[in-house]
């Protein structure tokens, strides 16, 4: 079953999302997925939609929202802040726990790229049952303040990203969230996945995340996969790794 849903975040803005629910049963383990920078709840070439349907067939509900300022949700892209993303994640998880399709004790937080960075940062706060990180984009933090200040020194406060207005204020806010220290404190099980052909997130970044989780992180690579897992093989492997991880924790 697929449902379109709307919720209000803590600032009163409407977030619009999609929920995929298995057909039989009442309360299911639920994956809350966070999309990447300039992305949306469907993902690159609908990869999140595909994975949500796959996991639904195996007994897992999936919750996917457009973050504030993205996709169909309220706001403009320039209104987005990293602090706001973290608040949205917490609000979405709290909403999910109240829904009759979700087991509130089995909420899994997932994210790709910037969404992975955000999910890792939010995890010590929201304490999900498990955490799944796909090529977490910690690299966007490094030099973020310097980039903003260099633009402002030239009198530029906003960039044009293929039609999306991106203000330097985002990077000033982002600077408050050093990726690895911000992720410390989560003690649950973690799945970390990277494609070996990812040119945006390197192996060292993933090993740094792996080191934070006290032996509870299962780091897997997909041979030849790029940052978006943009091949039929990569998608199938991604789905397989996620399902194996989930079933190792939760018996459906």
Which functions belong to the PLM regions below?
Residues 1-26:
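N-terminal cap/lid segment of alpha/beta-hydrolase-fold proteins
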Residues 79-100:
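Alpha/beta-hydrolase active-site loop
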